[in-house]
Swiss-Prot record:
Function comment: NDH-1 shuttles electrons from NADH, via FMN and iron-sulfur (Fe-S) centers, to quinones in the respiratory chain. The immediate electron acceptor for the enzyme in this species is believed to be ubiquinone. Couples the redox reaction to proton translocation (for every two electrons transferred, four hydrogen ions are translocated across the cytoplasmic membrane), and thus conserves the redox energy in a proton gradient.
Major localization class: membrane
Alphabetized HAMAP family for the sequence: NDH1_NuoN_1 (MF_00445)
Keywords, ordered alphabetically: Cell inner membrane, Cell membrane, Membrane, NAD, Quinone, Translocase, Transmembrane, Transmembrane helix, Transport, Ubiquinone
Gene Ontology terms, MF aspect: NADH dehydrogenase (ubiquinone) activity; NADH:ubiquinone reductase (non-electrogenic) activity; quinone binding
Principal EC category: translocase
EC number: 7.1.1.-
Name listed for the protein in its UniProt record: NADH-quinone oxidoreductase subunit N
GO terms (BP aspect): ATP synthesis coupled electron transport
Length: 474
């Protein structure tokens, strides 16, 4: 029985085994070799997940974990996003000790286990695995004062988040007497008078997830951590954990808490609206690019959360499309940011970039306009689908609010373009990409943004069919 279950966790076993073996090999092998082997481990894990792609839902180890098509696709996206981070680490030419890439593998192990969790026990344990590795990665650069400072801030606030989650789990178990997700679903579905304590437990768990997503008002750690950590770690923070927790949240809301939709819908509307306001007005006075994009990320999360709150097949499809395009845009963005030293990642260093590197300036401009939601770029269709879902489901005032705040947020995206094209250079910092591999990745992301409108209908249909097949419909 348990051997049959083992087949479904081969990706996780392979990944954690690879991490432990590489940790030992790091003593005798060159650190660059370890980074390459870490990347290969992630890609092999992608292949294993693809080979073991499970269409029908399978419960593993008496319901401790779950495997189905949705979870498998989510794992593949998480693993590929993580692979892009390690690829950028390799081609950036910057020195990182061998433990860095191994810690990323451990973090990814925690994240793909988290997305497959099917009980409160596996949920909390995998949540803590990824949290502990992220604590270490945040303050990995011992020589940088800001790195240590951001690591301490992240540790303290994340520990508080873990305490809130544990308290929520204890309340949820205390009132429902259930540990498995299916048991919790049955409890909420079959009881008309749901105890207030059980609802409070759910709210506390959602708060801890909002913290990891950097949704407002649980975003306090984001600007300092983005600025203080190395740029490659900032890229990891902005892409991989966010992707995981969006997929996880969608799964929990649809599989475990559909009967509480009226309760969590109001919470998510409030959190998403607060997020876009904090993003739009918080980013305006930022000059450090990593801090600026940390606030921008809060706004993007707000869009994804409001789309999740609507809870229909179309709105959930809009969330996934938004997430995928967000990942692509961030990969292109960090192709630029990774060229900076961590202390020189300043808006003023882009002055006159059009004259020094016109191709780079054009690529940045395309990515900024796409993030702002300017047609016909990819980012426009991501925001359009979210807003149209709001209108179709009667949330017209919220849709208008989001559109107006989105127009305000265009200010800081256009400010970057203005600095590149119209300000005279007074900095010795030369932003150029001499690495051909980085150039290729940057141009690829720009091409995706430019030609996405040709394929947008097909992408919508594929995602909608995928979600409908997995019973994510409203």
């Amino acid at each position: 029985m348990y051997w049959n279950n083992f087949v479904y966790i081969i990706p996780e076993v392979f990944l954690v085994s690879s991490s432990l073996i590489l940790l030992l090999l790091g003593i005798v092998l060159n650190k660059k070799v370890i980074h390459v082997l870490s990347l290969i481990s992630l890609l092999v894990t992608v292949g294993i997940v693809g080979i073991n792609l499970e269409i029908e839902p399978q419960l593993i180890f008496n319901g401790l974990l779950k495997s189905d098509l949705y979870i498998s696709i989510a794992k593949i996206i998480i693993l590929l996003s993580s692979s892009s981070v390690l690829f950028m680490l390799l081609v950036s030419g910057k020195e990182y000790c061998y433990e860095f890439s191994i810690m990323i593998l451990f973090a990814v192990f925690g994240l793909i286990t988290l997305i497959a969790a099917n009980s409160l026990l596996s949920f909390y344990l995998s949540f803590e695995i990824q949290s502990i590795t992220l604590y270490a990665l945040t303050c990995f650069d011992k020589s940088a004062i800001k790195s240590s400072e951001s690591g301490i801030k992240y540790f303290v606030l994340s520990a508080l988040s873990s305490c809130i989650m544990l308290y929520g789990i204890s309340m949820l178990y205390g009132y429902t007497t259930q540990v498995g997700f299916s048991g919790i679903y049955n409890f909420f579905s079959n009881n008309e008078n749901i105890p207030l304590g059980a609802i409070l437990g759910v709210i506390l768990i959602l708060i801890s997830i909002f913290f990891k997503l950097s949704a407002s008002p649980f975003h306090m750690w984001v600007p300092d951590v983005y600025q203080g950590t190395s740029t490659i770690m900032t890229m990891f923070f902005s892409i991989v954990p966010k992707s995981t927790f969006i997929f996880l949240l969608m799964r929990i809301l649809n599989e475990v808490l559909p009967s509480l939709s009226k309760d969590w819908q109001q919470i998510m509307i409030c959190v998403s609206m607060l997020s876009i306001f904090v993003s739009a007005f918080g980013a305006m006075r930022q000059t450090n690019l990593k801090r600026l994009f940390s606030y921008a990320a809060i706004g993007h999360i707000g869009y994804m959360l409001i789309s999740l709150a609507i809870n229909t097949t179309v709105s959930n499809a809009a969330t996934i499309m938004y997430l995928l395009l967000y990942v692509v845009m961030n990969i292109g963005l960090f192709c630029i940011l990774i060229q900076y030293d961590d202390d020189d990642c300043n808006l003023l260093n882009l002055k006159g970039l059009h004259n020094k590197s016109p191709v780079i300036a054009f690529c940045i401009a395309v990515i900024m306009l796409s993030m702002a939601g300017i047609p016909p770029l990819a980012g426009f269709f991501a925001k359009y689908d979210v807003l149209s879902s709001l209108v179709e489901n009667g949330f017209i005032k919220i849709a208008v609010t989001f559109a107006l705040v989105s127009a305000v947020s265009c200010y800081y995206y256009l400010k970057i373009i203005k600095v590149m094209y119209f300000d005279l250079s007074d900095s010795s910092c030369d932003v150029s990409i001499s690495n051909k591999k980085l150039c290729f990745v940057l141009l690829l992301t720009v091409v995706v943004n430019l030609v996405f409108f040709v394929f947008v209908g097909h992408v919508r249909n594929i995602i909608s069919y995928f979600l409908h097949f997995n019973f994510f419909n409203g």
